[in-house]
Curated annotation (Swiss-Prot):
<dbReference type="GO" id="GO:0008234">
    <property type="term" value="F:cysteine-type peptidase activity"/>
</dbReference>
<dbReference type="GO" id="GO:0097655">
    <property type="term" value="F:serpin family protein binding"/>
</dbReference>
<keyword id="KW-0325">Glycoprotein</keyword>
<feature type="propeptide">
    <location>
        <begin position="289"/>
        <end position="291"/>
    </location>
</feature>
<keyword id="KW-0788">Thiol protease</keyword>
<dbReference type="GO" id="GO:0004197">
    <property type="term" value="F:cysteine-type endopeptidase activity"/>
</dbReference>
<keyword id="KW-1015">Disulfide bond</keyword>
<dbReference type="GO" id="GO:0042583">
    <property type="term" value="C:chromaffin granule"/>
</dbReference>
<dbReference type="InterPro" id="IPR038765">
    <property type="entry name" value="Papain-like_cys_pep_sf"/>
</dbReference>
<dbReference type="GO" id="GO:0001968">
    <property type="term" value="F:fibronectin binding"/>
</dbReference>
<dbReference type="GO" id="GO:0016540">
    <property type="term" value="P:protein autoprocessing"/>
</dbReference>
<keyword id="KW-0378">Hydrolase</keyword>
<dbReference type="GO" id="GO:0071682">
    <property type="term" value="C:endocytic vesicle lumen"/>
</dbReference>
<dbReference type="GO" id="GO:0031638">
    <property type="term" value="P:zymogen activation"/>
</dbReference>
<feature type="site" description="Cleavage; by autolysis">
    <location>
        <begin position="112"/>
        <end position="113"/>
    </location>
</feature>
<feature type="propeptide" description="Activation peptide">
    <location>
        <begin position="18"/>
        <end position="113"/>
    </location>
</feature>
<feature type="site" description="Cleavage; by autolysis">
    <location>
        <begin position="106"/>
        <end position="107"/>
    </location>
</feature>
């Protein structure tokens, strides 16, 4: 596996005295700042606006090319508009692609033909979209999502689980709170600890604090975890037969940061260098089934305003696009 991803801060190198702005965007900039409660210091506002304008024009160009048939998805300005992609990766993406896998190996069911489409939201397996905030805890949200689904499968009750419990307490298993972690380490913590508290009893704070796990409020447990072979065919069978699956993807692209809707396909996406943990809750296709219109239905942890109500359709069966099948796993309960 690759060593821990080390992200460096990005230096804009823009002197405030030389900044020039597109005055036709003045009203949109003012509205965006108000919508997202942005208050800047005198020296910061200029270069933040420069970043925002650069992102806005990149989005407009992409959407124009979409209308010309050059892309399969649209983009939109969102809460990340004043951040560079380098800043965003440093703060938000927290999957650490570094260790050999130690779970049981998923055994594909023999003679099983997976359905053409699956959506576990329709079966009650999936909690509402959550928001990790400015904390590299994506791994915790991916892990709770998979465990929430398996607990529902076992008990018939869907209970939101505590990401904060994982952020604060799974350090001994190898996780690093807001600085990143692995879903398998989270599953290992739950097994070692003998339980995981509910979201209601141990709410999310978007910062690492001292461990406050209380067995009185534990509502989930697992007996280990299963790692899925690095093939989309195996992932498809796992999603169809097991439920929502934790996966990691390469999300380090502006196209993903500002994704709005459609099937996400990024030519520069890596199938090996993943930096973001998410949850596959199904798969399907748009219009008629063909090579370029199949997708994985993926739950993100950036709030409901991002993407399609917090979800993204990732290109499916296109050479393991963005590494979606490279680190897939789920807990056993």
């Amino acid at each position: 596996m690759n060593p821990t991803l080390i992200l460096a801060a990005f230096c804009l190198g823009i002197a405030s005295a030389t900044l020039t702005f597109d005055h036709s965007l003045e009203a949109q900039w003012t509205k965006w700042k108000a919508m997202h409660n942005r208050l800047y210091g005198m020296n910061e506002e200029g270069w933040r606006r420069a970043v925002w304008e650069k992102n806005m024009k990149m989005i407009e160009l992409h959407n124009q090319e979409y209308r010309e048939g050059k892309h399969s998805f649209t983009m939109a300005m969102n809460a990340f508009g004043d951040m560079t992609s380098e800043e965003f990766r440093q703060v938000m993406n927290g999957f650490q692609n570094r260790k050999p896998r130690k779970g049981k190996v998923f055994q594909e069911p023999l003679f099983y033909e997976a359905p053409r489409s699956v959506d576990w939201r329709e079966k009650g397996y999936v909690t509402p979209v959550k928001n990790q905030g400015q904390c590299g805890s994506c791994w915790a949200f991916s892990a709770t999502g998979a465990l929430e689904g398996q607990m529902f499968r076992k008990t018939g009750r869907l209970i939101s689980l505590s990401e904060q419990n994982l952020v604060d307490c799974s350090g001994p298993q190898g996780n690093e709170g807001c600085n990143g972690g692995l879903m398998d380490y989270a599953f290992q913590y739950v097994q070692d600890n003998g339980g995981l508290d509910s979201e209601e009893s141990y709410p999310y704070e978007a910062t690492e604090e001292s461990c406050k796990y209380n067995p009185k409020y534990s509502v989930a447990n697992d007996t280990g975890f299963v790692d899925i072979p690095k093939q989309e065919k195996a992932l498809m069978k796992a999603v169809a037969t097991v439920g929502p699956i934790s996966v990691a993807i390469d999300a380090g692209h502006e196209s993903f940061l500002f994704y709005k809707e459609g099937i996400y396909f990024e030519p520069d996406c890596s199938s090996e260098d993943m930096d973001h943990g998410v949850l596959v809750v199904g798969y399907g296709f748009e219009s008629t089934e063909s090579d370029n219109n199949k997708y994985w239905l993926v739950k993100n942890s950036w709030g409901e305003e991002w993407g399609m109500g917090g979800y993204v359709k990732m290109a499916k069966d296109r050479r393991n696009h963005c590494g979606i099948a490279s680190a897939a796993s789920y807990p056993t309960v």
